[in-house]
Amino acid sequence: MITETYNIMPFTSDHISGALGLSQAAGWPHRAEDWAMLLSVSKGMVAMDGDQIVATALVTPYGDVATVNMIIVDEKARGKGLGRKIMATAMALISPHEWRLIATVSGRPLYEKMGFKVTGEIMQLQGHSNPLSTHEISGDDLSWATLDDMDNLLMQDWAATGLKRDNLFKYFGKMAKVVVLNGHNGFGVMRDFGQGQVIGPVVAKSIEDAKKIYSFLLNTSAGVFVRTDVLGNENLSIWLEQQGLERVDQPISMAYGSSGSPKSDLEVFAITSQALA
């Protein structure tokens, strides 16, 4: 394996334009704004071949847990051990008890070699929903969250996921639309991403409550391209397909190490994104 010709250095905002070219070449939907958002809550490394970025890896700390994400290697630099090297270098930046990631088919062999184990599956759905067919909503069930709600929603998220995501929820409070089930029994987040908007996380006590959250958000985004990543719930995925979304991919979730299982009557129905868990 030959990696000595690549200069691996910390990922800074100056690298976003080069990273954008790399993700676009890989067919990923991220905009420059999406890279900037990820970098604002993460640390990372880039591999340079001269003045060209040929690989990236980010790590996003959430207390005892972290995700490793945006692992991309330029096609011409593959097969030289660069993916493993930049991933390991990025992971050395922080020391959580547990690592999580979402694996593509092409990335899974590398992650398994690094000790990651399969923990579940993700259903990626996207498209334009039909607001006329969405779940019946009572106006008393849901409301838009305010900044005063964010601390409570952060605690709900922590209880459901085991992730301490203070910085992410500060971002949500400023840049996302957040709907909350009255009685604080769940919430959903929608924000700009890629070709349109992404819905996630969605946290609720039941699939019926999750459908209410989705219906509320889908009705507010009629005509807009929407993506969501459902966490292993086939029934919810089928229902979303009935609302007009299309299942386009089914990657797997993987983990290395353990921080213990969260104990809560709240359930995660959709992750924030494949990068952010």
Where are the predicted features?
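A short, well-structured alpha-helix characteristic of acyl/acetyltransferase catalytic modules
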Residues: 1-3, 12-22, 133-135, 147-156, ...
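Active-site rim helix/loop that mediates acceptor-substrate recognition in acyltransferases
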Residues: 16, 20-56, 158-178
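Conserved beta-strand in the GNAT
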Residues: 46, 52-60, 65-72, 184-198
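Conserved acetyl-CoA-binding loop-helix of GNAT-fold acetyltransferases
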Residues: 73, 79-92, 113, 207-219, ...
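Conserved GNAT acetyl-CoA-binding A-motif
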Residues: 93-105, 222-232
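Active-site/acyl-donor-binding loops of N-acyltransferases
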Residues: 103, 114-133, 203, 227-277
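Amide-forming acyltransferase catalytic core, primarily the GNAT-like/NAT-type
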Residues: 116-198, 208-209
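Flexible loop/N-cap segments at domain edges
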Residues: 186-191, 197-232
